[in-house]
Design a protein with these regions (language model features):
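Acyl activation and transfer enzymes in specialized metabolism, enriched
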Residues: 49-75
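Helical lid/core segments from catalytic subdomains that handle acyl or acyl-like groups
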Residues: 101-135
Length: 135
């Protein structure tokens, strides 16, 4: 079972000057925040995605993760996050999902985002299985 979806990640990190970025104001607000996180709530009609899942046999949550990654990949701000007291620019995104592990607990799993759905699906299945079994 998969759950909450968050976006972050990157393999190559570059520290940037916050005052020279479009994230300067957000960085200043988040710098001393106890939990620097933003949560969006929105009701979405996922009927077409559910039909696609049933028609293709692809997991619904994987499709949701891919759609969120696809939307986020076009927004520059998602690549830049505060880390400690630094502002870091990442080279790629990953979608973080919560996986029910074999001990009936929850574990976090990062799936590197790929615009190619078949590659994202392979990574999703392999990584969520690995995380599920490793606890």
């Amino acid at each position: 079972m998969d759950g909450a979806i968050f976006i972050w990640k990157g393999d190559i990190m570059t520290e940037i000057n916050p005052q020279e970025s479009r994230r300067a104001e957000a960085y200043a607000l988040w710098l001393h925040a106890p939990m620097p996180m933003v949560t969006f709530f929105r009701t979405l009609d996922v009927t077409r995605l559910l039909r696609c899942s049933r028609r293709t046999g692809l997991k619904f949550n994987m499709l949701m993760c891919w759609c969120i990654g696809q939307a986020a990949s076009g927004i520059e701000e998602f690549y830049t996050l505060p880390v400690g007291d630094k502002l870091i620019r990442y080279d790629q995104l990953a979608v973080n999902t919560i996986v029910l592990n074999r001990e009936d607990g929850i574990s976090s799993c990062d799936i590197p985002f790929s615009a190619e759905l078949s590659q994202f699906n392979r990574d999703y299945l392999a990584l969520t299985t690995q995380v599920r079994e490793s606890c």
